[in-house]
Amino acid sequence: MDTKFSTAIHMLILVSEAETPMNSDQIAQSVGTNASYVRKVAARLGHAGIIGSRGRSGFCLLKAPDEITFLEVYRAVEETDHVHVFDIHQNPSDACIVGRNIRPVLGGMFRHAEEVVEDELAGATLADCMARMREEIDRNSHQQEGKRQ
């Protein structure tokens, strides 16, 4: 798994919380990547109708944060309809009893786990993540205040 999904969530929070539109250079600085990668992720989010571009001035959300599910974001940036977390090695030996049976056994177990992940992503919204972010910021600011005293 690569980092497009977490990058997309980071971007969407920034765009949602910014008082003025943020461009790809500003987002890239916060994410810790380059602007071309941000534009690549943004293009996928744009095709999915999640964000729009305001010319060179920056990006804007096209939906309210409580209407954007993590599953929708995942599907947009990974360009797939199914959550894919696990891979199975490709060439197990048919001469071995385990090798002959490992792919169907693990395939079923892995698909079940991916369905659970998919359900969790479908139930989580950008607004949920933003609320947790605010809690984390508040907790960290209180910890910093305690250290100063």
Residue ranges and their predicted role:
Residues 1-11:
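Short alpha-helical segments that sit at the start of domains
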Residues 15-19, 63-64:
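Short helix-capping/hinge SLiMs at alpha-helix to coil transitions
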Residues 20-28:
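Short acidic, hydrophobic short linear motifs in intrinsically disordered regions
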Residues 42-48:
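Basic amphipathic alpha-helical segments that dock to polyanions
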Residues 48-56, 60-62:
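Beta-hairpin "wing" of winged helix-turn-helix
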Residues 65-91:
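Conserved segment of winged-helix/HTH DNA-binding domains
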Residues 90-149:
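C-terminal regulatory/oligomerization modules of transcriptional regulators
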